[in-house]
Each structure stands twice: as structure tokens, then as C-alpha cells.
Amino acid sequence: MALNDFHVSEPYTLGIELEMQVINPPGYDLSQDSSTLIDAVKPQLTAGEIKHDITESMLEMATGVCRDIDQAAAQLSAMQHVILQAASEHHLGICGGGTHPFQKWQRQEVCDNERYQRTLENFGYLIQQATVFGQHVHVGCANGDDAIYLLHGLSHFVPHFIALSAASPYMQGADTRFACARLNIFSAFPDNGPMPWVSNWQEFAGLFRRLSYTTMIDSIKDLHWDIRPSPAFGTVEVRVMDTPLTLDHAINMAGLIQATAHWLLTERPFKPQEQDYLLYKFNRFQACRYGLEGVLTDAYTGDRRRLADDTLRLLDNVTPSARKLGADSAIDALRLQVKKGGNEAQYMREFIADGGSLIGLVQKHCEIWAGQ
């Protein structure tokens, strides 16, 4: 199958997708009513899109093309308002978090959508288990070769993005001991983790053609790499973040990725090499398991450094780019988060340690998303 030409888009423009949990009070398990909400809110939208994801307990909010994080925040805030209003009318709740802490995957209903039904046929129960919730950020690129360079550059910071956004410590009623357990769900998929090595867009087109020979790949959307190019949009899409508990944190993560993209494409601080990925999965695991307390290992020197310290260094490097893009507030907020030493997974564990229940935790998450 031939790959679409890379659509030229304005560099550093943004698109944000948030996969939200649809909750059924008072038990606060996942609901199977996303279709009801989507039908209710679609006529009210003036920008962005609200749509299905894999199962009926998932609802995706997606912005249009945004020039900066302020425009993205305005679109998401408007969508949040209409979704919360419709959810209240249907006696449902909405919340963030990378996993629901006690849902049973066997109960999840795959959406009546041709693509998702085909995916269910290919992957079986793995698709129901993939009822987890992530944030995806698209960044615009001028051409395909820039997109491949940006993908490799951003891959250096996958552990940092995971650690800052980690919000999935509980699954199936148990503490997983991971800060981000969500990404483990995808480990059985054949396209899990980093994209196979290519050095330019022409090589990527050849890779896609060979992948399509498997008959499991009909489009880029069927590839679930941590970071992937999206030629139809003219973007690179970062897919490793848990859905945050607040809209503010989602915007901060998008601002970081936008600023990092600007720094990478203007400064070109790396010359991508295949060996860059030698310890990729080990460093990714450290971020998933330990969050900001994880330890990164340099594939070339063997040097080890705390993820928190390296994240502060990243934030310093991208600060000038953030100022140019109007994203400096995001960098300031994330710097404060790192210095305080926490993420949302840590907050969740503190809630339980203080005597809270998992049901109470989901209730609290719904209240947080509703601004209560």
C-alpha cells in the first residue's frame, strides 16, 4: 500500500487529543455510554471534535489546528464545558487518568465502528484490555524529512514525557507499583514501542510499504508507535502520555512538546543514529516504573543520571523556544512540578494511603475534572 504524501503544515502548530473516561456513578465504574454523550454534544461544538475511541467507555476530545497553547486551551475548555453539561444530564461522570483503577476489561464493549471491529478481529482480547487513556500531541512540520528528524529527536525525551504525565498506578483493583502502568498494556502488540529505524522520509515510505504486506496495516492509524509521523496532517504525533487529571496539565505537556520540537528543529542538537535506540526500552521502563525517580543510562558512555535532573536540563534547554511560542507558562509549571518531586500517580497513592478507596479516588477525579 502506498503512503500518502506528507502534507505541508505550518511548523510548530499544535493539535491535542485527550482520551477521557466515561464514569457511571455512584459505583464509579466505567460506563458503556460514550455514544450517548457523543450524540448529545456534537451539535454544540464550534471548534474541535468529540468522537469515539476503542471502547464505549472512552471519549476522545481533539482540538483543531492551533497556533499556540492558548488557542488549544480555549478549544479544549469549550469542549470540556459541553461534555460536562451533557454528562450531568445523563447522570454520568468524566475524568482523566491513564487507567481506571478497578474496571474489568472483560466488560468493555468495542465501539460499533468498522475500523475498531477489524482491530478486534486482528487482536482479540488485547483490544478490550486497551481500555486505557492517553494524551496525544501533534506538532506541525514543513516536510517529511523534518518529521523524521523531529521524531528521532523527540525519542530522546520519551522517558521525560512519561514521567511528567504518569497517572496510572492502579489497574484491575491493585497497585501495580508503576507510575505509568498504561503503556504496559501495549507490550503484546507487534508495533509497540519505537518506530523501526529509518533516516529520511523516502526510507519511511519503504518501511510503511513493507509493513502493509502484513495485511494488518491499512493506514498510519494502525501503527501504535510511541511517536509516529502523520502525513495526512503534516505532523509528528507523540503518544506516550497518560491523560492528565486536569486540563491545565494537558496544556503544559503540549507546551513542552511544542517547545522541544522548536528547539530540536532550529538548533539540531542531535545527529540521529540507530544506536540512539539501544537502551530506549530500558530508559522507557525506568520512567514507567519509577516516574521522575527513574534513572537514565546513556547508550554511548554508560553514564547514569536521575530522570528528574535530566528533565530540569531539558526544561532549561527549551525555555528560549517556549518564550518564542508563548509556552513559557507551561515550562514554568513543569519546572515547579519537578522541583516538588511529584506527579499525579504519586498524588493517587497518597489519597489511598490517607484512607481513601479506589471508588473514592475515581469520584475525586471526576470532581477535579469538573473543577469542583
From Swiss-Prot:
GO molecular function, one term: ATP binding
InterPro entries referenced in this protein's UniProt entry, alphabetically: GCL_type2/YbdK_subfam, GCS2, Gln_synth/guanido_kin_cat_dom, YbdK
Annotated keywords: ATP-binding, Ligase, Nucleotide-binding
Database matches in Gene3D superfamilies: 3.30.590.20
Residue stretches spanning the membrane: none
GO biological process: modified amino acid biosynthetic process
Keyword Magnesium set for record: no
Entry EC no(s): 6.3.2.2
Catalysed conversion reaction: L-cysteine + L-glutamate + ATP = gamma-L-glutamyl-L-cysteine + ADP + phosphate + H(+)
A Pfam family reported for this protein in Swiss-Prot or TrEMBL: GCS2
Protein purpose: ATP-dependent carboxylate-amine ligase which exhibits weak glutamate--cysteine ligase activity.
Binding partners and assembly: Homodimer.
Family: Belongs to the glutamate--cysteine ligase type 2 family. YbdK subfamily.
Official protein name in the record: Putative glutamate--cysteine ligase 2
Lineage, highest ranks first: Bacteria, Pseudomonadati, Pseudomonadota, Gammaproteobacteria, Enterobacterales
